[in-house]
Each structure stands twice: as C-alpha cells, then as structure tokens.
From Swiss-Prot:
It is an enzyme of class 6 (ligase). It comes from Clostridium tetani (strain Massachusetts / E88). This is Serine--tRNA ligase. GO terms for cellular component: cytoplasm. The gene is serS. InterPro entries: aa-tRNA-synt_IIb, aa-tRNA-synth_II, aa-tRNA-synth_II/BPL/LPL, Ser-tRNA-ligase_type_1, Ser-tRNA-synth_1_N, SerRS_1_N_sf, SerRS_core, tRNA-bd_arm. Catalyzes the attachment of serine to tRNA(Ser). Is also able to aminoacylate tRNA(Sec) with serine, to form the misacylated tRNA L-seryl-tRNA(Sec), which will be further converted into selenocysteinyl-tRNA(Sec). The keyword Protein biosynthesis applies. Pathway: Aminoacyl-tRNA biosynthesis; selenocysteinyl-tRNA(Sec) biosynthesis; L-seryl-tRNA(Sec) from L-serine and tRNA(Sec): step 1/1. GO terms for molecular function: ATP binding; catalytic activity, acting on a protein; serine-tRNA ligase activity; transferase activity. GO terms for biological process: selenocysteine biosynthetic process; seryl-tRNA aminoacylation.
Length: 426
C-alpha cells in the first residue's frame, strides 16, 4: 500500500510513475483518492467544530441549572449537534472504506532503475552463468525422461487429482527431497538465514498484507467455511509472522528461509506450460524473506539474489539474471530480478526465482514497523523476498541438463550426500 501523504504531496509524480505499470491500472483513481481524502479532511474539521460547540453548550448547563434557568433549548441544540456529528461520522466511515478499497488496489511505485517496457520481452539481461547445455544426441524433455525412468507419474496424478499434478516416485521423490535439503542447508549454514516452517493455510488478513488480496483472489485456493487460503508461497506466512509488530532496529536485517508446498490455481494460464513440472497447482519451493531498514534494502536485495544464484551454481545449472521491466513487474514489487535456468526442451531460459524489493509496500499493508530506541517513533520496515529456489523446476532442470545419451541422469555432486551416495538415476 502506498503512503497517502505521498500521494497527496506529489499526485502527478505518482501518476507518472504508475503509468505503464502493466497492471491495467487507471491512474485516474489517484484523483478519486485525493477527492475522497479532501472530503474526509473537511468533514474532520467540521466534526471537530461541532464537538467544540457541543462542549461549549454542555458547559452552560450546570450554571443554568444553578440559576434556575430552563435548559430545554440547550438540550435540544445538543441533540441536534449529536445528530449532525453522527451523520458525519457515518460518512467518514464510508469514505474510509472507499479510500481503503482503492488504496489496496493501487500497485507499488517502480524504482527509478526499473527498465521501461510492456512485457517480458523488454526485460533486461544483467548477467549469465554457465553455458546453455548442448548435446551430441537428441535430448528428451523432462516429462518424457521422467516417465521413462519411472520417477515421475503425471497420468496417475491426473487420475487421482487432475491436471497439473504429479507423483514423484522412487529416486524422483528422493531427488526432490535432496534439492529441498540442499537449499535449506546452504541458506542456513552458509548464508545465515534462520529457518521457519510455516503453516500452509493463512487467513484473509495475511493474504492482504503481502498483496495477494484483493487483486489475485482468483489465483488462490480458498477454504470457504473458514475463509482460509492455501498459501501460494511461503512469503505470505513468513512476512505476516511480524504483522502488527514493532521490530528492534538492532535486529535488522532479519533473514528467514522457509520450505513449503505452494498452491496456485494458475487462473489465466490455460494452454501455457501444460506438460511437466513448470506450472503446477501444487509445487515445492524454498523461500527467502528479509526485513530491513529502508537504507539497507537495495544492498540486501543484491545479496538475496546472489544467495539464490549460489545454490544454482552449486548444482551446475546454467542460468541468467534479468531485471524486470515496468510492464512485467507485477503488483507488489518496486524492483525485481528474475533468475532463469536453461531448459533444453524449451530451448530458452525459464524463470526459477523472482527476487524482489517491496520497499514499504507490504509493511504498510501488514503494519510491520521498527525503531532503534524504545522512545523513537516507529518507521515501516522494507520487506524483500525471493525464491531460493523453486524445487520442481530445479528437478526439471536437472533432468534435462544432466541427461545422458543412454537415458540416464547424472546427479549433481552437491546432491549425492542427500541421495545415499548415488551418482546416477537409471
């Protein structure tokens, strides 16, 4: 959520910054917010004036009674004032609701370093690591090779549940688990993150705090009776861990890593990546979340991105890092990097991690603040997060990049201790 004071102070600057955001966002809502805000402030002045008048009239009553004067006129006027105040308070409540409704739907302001552009084709490549894998034979897609090796079963998952679900079997299940443990151990032991194991269901306030609601409710799986949501990412519960709290400035930056299953309806993605592990309704992910002071946040974003890159380098998977343009930035981020791994079956790089700085956009929604000293005025933290990284897509990348001519898969060295010493899937 944006700072209303900032909108009030620089409305044209805000509208210019949000133009071309790629969110089908109508900048005229900024004018609507300002109109409501002005009405609200005028009503507050009027209410204060009426309350002062009521107080003055009320103060006359004891003296009138002492002097034996009739107070009926004063009581009638006070009743009339109370009625006016009640009506104005009701209007204030309506305005507050309207302002909140609009503010929750205004996207974040892009950082000045965000490239201009309308789609992912306009994202800017920052760097690459490794060379795109080439073969002296015709490589197979992971969905074919995984089935051939009996480590992935899409057909039976479709029978048991439906499309976009998978059974991992045998060494496939063990490979998935190995990737999870390798990622967690590296981020905890080498990068200094504290592990969190979060709930897989959250309430509506949590989904609103991180920005999934109200805009993206159709993408979420909801339990109607409880009004709980299956988490689309561990970002939601881990960020909301400190909702409505004031953190100690001396504890910042705080760094958390969390493994979780993630659940997404993938509304609007019909026909996209329908085969394999790339776009599933349920998938595993290791998430990195940071809480920082404002002046630290962009340095910490670079570190977070490097941490995500580091685990991919350890596996030897070729990747590139791109800076996301305005039109592809998404709703909540101020600046975002995508890490994309090379996928031979697609003959292109495929996103495996998004690393974002939300500045104070989420912390305003979730009311997460910090202060240096007990008597200091609290300020909003900056929140950051990134996949560290998506596990199913990692498995897909391993299968495709490390496949051999005989249909076997070489297991990356970093994973072998988690695989009982095995070095090949056959």
């Amino acid at each position: 959520m944006l700072d209303l004071k900032r909108i009030r102070s620089n409305p044209e600057e805000i509208k210019k910054a949000l133009a071309g955001r790629g969110e089908d966002f109508d900048v005229s809502v900024i004018d609507k917010v300002l109109q409501l805000d002005e009405e609200r402030r005028n009503i507050l002045v009027e209410v204060e004036s009426l309350k002062n008048k009521r107080k003055q009239e009320s103060a006359k009553i004891p003296q009138f009674k002492k002097e034996g004067k009739n107070v009926d006129d004063i009581m009638a006027e006070m009743k009339e004032l109370a009625g006016k105040i009640k009506k104005l308070d009701e209007r204030l409540s309506e305005i507050d609701g309207s302002i909140e409704y609009i503010m929750l739907r205004i996207p974040n302001i892009p950082n000045p370093n965000v490239p201009n552009g309308d789609s992912d084709e306009d994202n800017v490549e920052i760097r690459r690591w490794g060379e795109a894998t080439t073969f002296e034979f015709e490589p197979k897609a992971h969905w074919d090779l995984g089935v051939n090796l009996d480590i992935l079963d899409f057909e039976r998952a479709g029978k048991v549940t439906g499309s976009r679900f998978t059974f991992y079997k045998g060494l496939g299940a063990r490979l998935e688990r190995a990737v999870i443990n390798y990622y967690l151990d590296t981020h905890i032991d080498e990068h200094g993150y504290t592990e969190i194991l979060p709930p897989y269901m959250v309430n509506r306030k949590s989904m609103t705090g991180t920005g999934q609601l109200p805009k993206f409710e159709e993408d979420a799986f909801r339990l109607e009776e409880q009004d709980y949501f299956l988490i689309p990412t561990a970002e939601v519960p881990v960020t909301n861990l400190y909702r409505d709290e004031i953190l100690n400035g001396s504890d910042l930056p705080m760094k958390h890593v969390a493994y979780s299953a993630c659940f997404r309806s993938e509304a609007g993605s019909a026909g996209r990546d329908t085969r394999g592990l790339v776009r599933q309704h349920q998938f595993n992910k290791v998430e990195l979340v940071k809480f920082t002071k404002p002046e630290q946040s962009y340095e910490e974003l670079e570190k977070l991105t490097k941490d995500a890159e580091d685990v991919l380098q350890g596996l030897g998977i070729p990747y590139r890092v791109v800076r996301i343009c305005k039109g592809d930035l998404g709703f909540t981020a101020a600046l975002k990097y995508d890490i994309e791994v090379w996928m031979p079956s697609y003959n292109r790089y495929v996103e495996i991690s998004s690393c974002s700085n939300f500045e104070d956009f989420q912390s305003r929604r979730a009311n997460i603040k910090y202060r240096e000293n007990p008597k200091d005025k609290p300020n909003f933290v900056h929140t950051l997060n990134g996949s560290g990284v998506a596990v199913g897509r990692t498995v897909a990348a391993i299968i495709e990049n490390f496949q051999q001519a005989d249909g076997t898969i070489i297991i990356p060295e970093k994973l072998r201790p988690y695989m009982g010493g095995k070095d090949v899937i056959k």
